[in-house]
Amino acid sequence: MTDKPFWQTKNLNQLTRSEWESLCDGCGQCCLHKLQDEDTDEIYWTSVACTLLNPETCQCRDYPNRKKTVPDCVFLTPEIVDEVDWLPVTCAYRLVAEGSDLYWWHPLVSGSPETVHEAGISVRGKVTAFDHDMQDDDDYLDHMVTPDKIAR
C-alpha cells in the first residue's frame, strides 16, 4: 500500500467519481467567460461569470442541474481535459493530466477550502459582471482581463 495521495498515483481515467470531484480546487476560473479570436484562435479571459456562479464561494449555485440552466456549460471529463485549452495552468485536472503535483493551496493539500481564496487563485472579489448582464457579445469586451488579473 502506498502512502501517496491518489492524485500522485492515479491518472484521471482511474479516479473514482468522488476523487474526480475533490480534484476541483473551487477557484471558479472555469466559470468565467472566455473569448476566442476567430482568426487566431487565441483565448482571452473576461471577468464575466456564469449566471450560476456564486462569486463569494466560487461554487456553482446549482451544480447538479447546471446543464439545464446553462446548456453550454462544459462538463470536464478525463477525455477532454487535454483538449480544453482555456483551463488555467493552476487547474488540478490539468496538473494531474500533465503528471504534475497540486499546489500548496489546493484544498486536498492544505486541508482547507479557504486557501485557494487566501492565495488569490480564486475569482473571489474579481467578478465584475454576470452573463445575464451582457446585452450583446461586444459587452464582454469591456470586461477583458489578463489571466494574472484573475489569479495572482
Curated annotation (Swiss-Prot):
Originating organism? Brucella canis (strain ATCC 23365 / NCTC 10854 / RM-666)
User: What residue ranges carry the coiled-coil annotation?
Assistant: none
Record-given protein name: UPF0260 protein BCAN_A1514
Q: Which InterPro entries match?
A: Puta_zinc/iron-chelating_dom (IPR005358), UCP006173 (IPR008228)
Please give the start and end residues of each transmembrane region: none
Domain of life per record:
Bacteria
Q: Which family does it belong to?
A: Belongs to the UPF0260 family.
- Cross-referenced NCBIfam families: PRK05170.1-5, PRK05170.2-5
